[in-house]
């Protein structure tokens, strides 16, 4: 296993650590959990950079990197929804997690049809979405659930991330729609002929 893949595996292994820290009954536990999450988020940039720089990109790394990111974000969102328990956090969390489920299912279905990922990536929007998500999660994990300046700022960034996430999902579905309409009809006819 190469260095970038080891860093990605480390990111996955940090998830139970920030969960444990989050639930410790100490004043410093929120900040410790947030620090581990921030470190894990930084490794996301580092593993990609090293994979390109050292020419160590692998199919395993291409698979594991987004899985590690999605696991890390989903777990942090679940922790925060449970801890804060309000609409300002729950709604964007549902949008972010829901988008990952929809897009993952769409990618799998498109792959079964022999189609590649619809449309191109939009690095600028993807980077903004990721930055808003990570910033929101670092801020919210670091603070107990009270309406302080920092928590409200975290909510604001999470609402922005939720909006960008919804936008990216709609763009992805729009790009895939022509394939879904034509190939979907073929799939239905094939299914009906077998039935």
Curated annotation (Swiss-Prot):
Keywords: Cell membrane, Lipid biosynthesis, Lipid metabolism, Membrane, Phospholipid biosynthesis, Phospholipid metabolism, Transferase, Transmembrane, Transmembrane helix. Pathway: Phospholipid metabolism; phosphatidylglycerol biosynthesis; phosphatidylglycerol from CDP-diacylglycerol: step 1/2. This is CDP-diacylglycerol--glycerol-3-phosphate 3-phosphatidyltransferase. One of its GO terms (molecular function) is CDP-diacylglycerol-glycerol-3-phosphate 3-phosphatidyltransferase activity. This protein catalyzes the committed step to the synthesis of the acidic phospholipids. NCBIfam families: pgsA. It comes from Pseudomonas fluorescens. Its EC number is 2.7.8.5. It is a multi-pass membrane protein. Belongs to the CDP-alcohol phosphatidyltransferase class-I family. It is an enzyme of class 2 (transferase). It catalyses: a CDP-1,2-diacyl-sn-glycerol + sn-glycerol 3-phosphate = a 1,2-diacyl-sn-glycero-3-phospho-(1'-sn-glycero-3'-phosphate) + CMP + H(+). The keyword Coiled coil does not apply. Its main location: membrane. GO terms for cellular component: plasma membrane. It holds the Pfam family CDP-OH_P_transf. The chain crosses the membrane at residues 7-24, 60-81, 134-150, 157-173. It is found in: Cell membrane.
């Amino acid at each position: 296993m190469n260095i970038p893949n080891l860093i990605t595996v480390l990111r996955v292994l940090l998830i139970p650590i920030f969960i444990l820290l989050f639930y410790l009954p100490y004043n410093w536990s929120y900040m410790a959990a947030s620090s581990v999450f921030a470190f894990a988020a930084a490794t996301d940039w580092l593993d990609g950079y090293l994979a390109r720089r050292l020419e160590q990109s692998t199919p395993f790394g291409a698979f594991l990197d987004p899985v590690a990111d999605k696991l890390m974000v989903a777990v942090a969102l679940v922790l925060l929804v449970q801890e804060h328990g309000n609409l300002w956090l729950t709604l964007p969390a549902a949008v972010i997690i829901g988008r990952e489920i929809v897009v993952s299912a769409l990618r799998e279905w498109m792959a079964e049809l022999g189609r590649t990922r619809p449309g191109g990536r939009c690095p600028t929007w993807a980077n903004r979405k990721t930055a808003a998500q990570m910033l929101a999660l670092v801020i919210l994990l670091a603070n107990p659930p009270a309406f302080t300046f920092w928590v409200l700022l975290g909510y604001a960034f999470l609402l922005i991330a939720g909006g960008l996430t919804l936008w990216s999902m709609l763009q992805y579905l729009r790009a895939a729609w022509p394939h879904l309409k034509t190939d979907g009809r073929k799939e239905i006819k094939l299914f009906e002929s077998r039935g």
